[in-house]
A protein has these predicted regions:
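Short, conserved beta-strand segments within well-ordered enzyme catalytic domains
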Residues: 75, 90-92, 101-105, 131-133, ...
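C-terminal helical cap(s) of enzyme catalytic domains, especially alpha/beta-barrels
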Residues: 67, 199, 331-338, 380-400
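Charged C-terminal helix
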Residues: 398-422
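A gly/proline- and charged-residue-enriched helix-loop-helix capping module
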Residues: 127-167
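Short beta->alpha linker loops
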Residues: 58-59, 136-140, 162, 299, ...
């Protein structure tokens, strides 16, 4: 079966029978279908530092728990005796038809999970006909990922640097490589308090990881100082050798010496954060790109209303997967109020989605589409491109079957009447 034929077939039974038939031959799925088992297997495939960074959250991880708890509180209410022999998962976003109502979320530093990083994800997304949002903190430059995706949908996530010239350069590159929207992440103007990473003393960017968009950018490179600033800090111990070798290796990949690479990391840390980012910057952004603009990290209806007033094209209800503020509201709980305030503006949602049933619940509460994050990274850690592809197919399959078993034939039929709240 060709890729196009596979995509047009009902993904639920197709994937289900693929697993059962190979199982009858003695082969179990290499990518666990159960979310908890998927996370556990991925954790065992990664270093302790990578697992902490990817799996962990802010503070006591109460927000992460709240995200999952919100999905548990909502229950789908199936209808019976409906003709569900044909189902339609497609949605339209900003003039483009998408195979399914989810995209792969922007997640940085994917080289921690697998050596092929973003490139493996881009190839898997393209093969499955699913959109991918390139991370600002990617391990592979956006142009390489775009080339791998050919005509498949891709967007670009922007972390607004304190250097506007660099921001403009990123936006130009995104336009030039075929990105179809800009997703401005608003909830990381400062880094959240993440105990798992703090206990390990681990921030990947200081090791030169997750900086591909920077090290490949002409504006950023032109501003790298001749040598790193003197901090007075003198690291000691055996691990410093591994750090130096890692920086040297990373610099070599971008044509930079060790000294230049250390200076590049210092320049990144000096310009990354924008705690003064405000609504006037969003107004200016309209003049900086011709692409649709989405604001990611909106949780309050008044912020959604402000986005509408400024002519923003969409918002993403997100709490960064529980990685920024500990003890805040779950995104699913605030989704309906944001949808109401957004009026006709598309609202997407992420944080806590682990299954096709979760996607159905988010759509029923008004999300036009969702972003899937950690699950595909777990697939990447276990089996690279193939692992990402399996996670995507499992998501599609469960969503398709959930839709049918709820008596629905299209994701557009999902609404509040399809849910009961415990």
């Amino acid at each position: 079966m060709s890729d196009s034929e596979r995509r047009s077939a009902a993904p639920g039974r197709l994937r289900q029978m693929e697993i059962y038939v190979t199982g009858a031959g003695g082969t179990r799925p290499r990518i666990p279908v159960q979310p908890a088992a998927l996370e556990a297997k991925a954790a065992s495939a990664m270093s302790a530092q990578a697992a902490a960074y990817i799996i962990g959250g802010a503070g006591g991880e109460a927000t992460m728990s709240a995200n999952r708890g919100a999905f548990d509180r909502y229950r789908l209410v199936p209808r019976v005796l409906q003709d569900v022999s044909k189902r339609d998962l497609t949605v339209r976003l900003f003039g483009r038809a998408h195979r399914a109502p989810f995209l792969l979320a922007p997640i940085g530093v994917l080289e921690m999970a697998h050596r092929e990083a973003d490139l493996a994800v881009a190839r898997a997304a393209a093969s499955e006909g699913i959109g991918f949002i390139f991370s600002n903190q990617a391990s592979v430059a956006m142009e390489k990922c775009a080339s791998a995706m050919e005509k498949a949908p891709r967007w670009f996530q922007l972390y607004w640097s304190s250097d506007d010239e660099f921001v403009r350069s990123l936006l130009r590159r995104a336009e030039d490589c075929g990105c179809e929207a800009i997703v401005v992440t608003l909830d990381t103007t400062l880094l959240g308090w993440r105990p798992r990473d703090l206990d390990l003393g681990y921030l990947p960017f200081l090791l030169g990881l997750g900086l591909a968009q920077y090290l490949s950018d002409p504006v950023f490179r032109a501003k790298i100082p001749a040598s790193p600033p003197e901090t007075g800090f003198r690291p000691r111990g055996a691990k410093i050798l591994a750090t130096v070798l890692g920086l040297k290796r990373k610099g070599r990949a971008f044509g930079l010496s060790l000294r230049e690479m250390r200076a590049a990391v210092a320049h990144f840390t000096a310009t990354y954060s924008r705690p003064d980012l405000n609504w006037s910057d969003i107004e200016r952004l309209r003049g900086m790109t011709k692409l649709p603009i989405l604001l990611k990290g909106v949780r309050h209806p008044e912020d959604a209303a402000k986005a509408v007033a400024l002519g923003v094209d969409g918002v993403v209800v997100s709490n960064h997967g529980g990685r920024q503020v500990d003890g805040e509201t779950a995104t699913l709980d605030v989704l309906p109020s944001v949808v109401a305030a957004a009026k006709d503006m598309p609202v997407l949602m992420d944080s806590g989605i682990r299954s096709g049933a979760d996607i159905a619940k988010a759509l029923a509460l008004g999300a036009r589409a969702v972003l899937v994050g950690r699950p595909y990274v777990y697939g990447l850690a276990i089996a690279g491109q193939a692992g990402v592809g399996e996670v995507i197919r499992n998501m599609l399959a469960e969503l398709d079957l959930t839709l049918a078993l709820c008596g629905l034939t299209s994701v557009s039929e999902l609404g509040p009447e399809c849910l009961a709240k415990n």
